[in-house]
């Protein structure tokens, strides 16, 4: 499901947009303050962000700038500022579109659809803030890169791709190390420990559950 973040301090407007987007089958998060809005944008994977300019604590331009340093997520600015200077500033800071309040909700929905059509499909798996980019062979946790060896990456990918399914140690060895390997099953336990140690600073080590006597599972 397409995920959209709304960062807007006018709660009634934010809630109205949320209801309209949910009616269109979008998955929606809302933040009413700039600081948590920025944190949520950087620690999650969104398909599009709707961003007000005049926000508490961190203004929309600064949020836009910081997002652009880390992501290419499409940003549509929604604001009462209608001057050409403000529009140019918003676009120069990295926004992809700019719509002035008050606006017709149908126009906003059309702009969202148009923006999403222009975006390439992301080949990502996202579970509990652990994001695996299958094209780039990279993993981020809450927006921060996770440094993994090839074997660690292959093991984490296997667990996440088979989320909610308990994988036996023998199956893990076959899928990660290959059919003709002489690796013992206890090596799986060693690499699970490596992964948990790397996930622990993010509070994600418990995402990999042990099923005693069987193997391991990552649950959605």
Swiss-Prot record:
GO annotation, cellular component aspect: cytosol; protein-DNA complex
CDD domains: trans_reg_C
PTM info: Phosphorylated by ArlS.
Entries under InterPro entries matching the protein: CheY-like_superfamily, OmpR/PhoB-type_DNA-bd, Sig_transdc_resp-reg_C-effctor, Sig_transdc_resp-reg_receiver, WalR-like, WH-like_DNA-bd_sf
GO BP terms in the entry: regulation of DNA-templated transcription
Annotated localization: Cytoplasm
Assigned keywords, A-Z: Cytoplasm, DNA-binding, Phosphoprotein, Transcription, Transcription regulation, Two-component regulatory system
Residues in the DNA-binding region annotation: 122-220
Name of the molecule in the record: Response regulator ArlR
Gene: arlR
């Amino acid at each position: 499901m397409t995920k959209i973040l709304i960062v807007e301090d006018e709660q009634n407007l934010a809630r109205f947009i949320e209801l309209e987007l949910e009616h269109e089958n979008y998955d929606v998060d809302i933040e009413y303050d700039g600081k948590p809005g920025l944190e949520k944008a950087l620690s999650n994977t969104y398909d599009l962000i709707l961003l007000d300019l005049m926000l508490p604590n961190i203004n929309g331009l600064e949020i836009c700038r910081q997002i652009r340093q880390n992501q290419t997520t499409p940003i549509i600015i929604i604001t009462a500022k209608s001057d050409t200077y403000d529009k140019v500033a918003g676009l120069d800071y990295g926004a992809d579109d700019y719509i002035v309040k008050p606006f017709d909700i149908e126009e906003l929905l059309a702009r969202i659809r148009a923006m999403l059509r222009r975006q390439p499909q992301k080949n990502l798996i996202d579970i509990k803030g652990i994001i695996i980019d299958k094209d780039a062979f990279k993993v981020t946790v809450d927006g921060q890169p996770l440094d993994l060896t090839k074997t660690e990456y292959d093991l984490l990918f296997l667990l996440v791709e088979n989320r909610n399914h308990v994988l036996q140690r023998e199956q893990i060895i076959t899928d990660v190390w290959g059919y003709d390997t002489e690796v013992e099953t206890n090596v799986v336990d060693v690499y699970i420990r490596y992964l948990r140690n790397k996930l622990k600073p993010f509070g994600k080590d418990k995402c990999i559950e042990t099923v005693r006597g069987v193997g391991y599972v990552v649950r959605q």
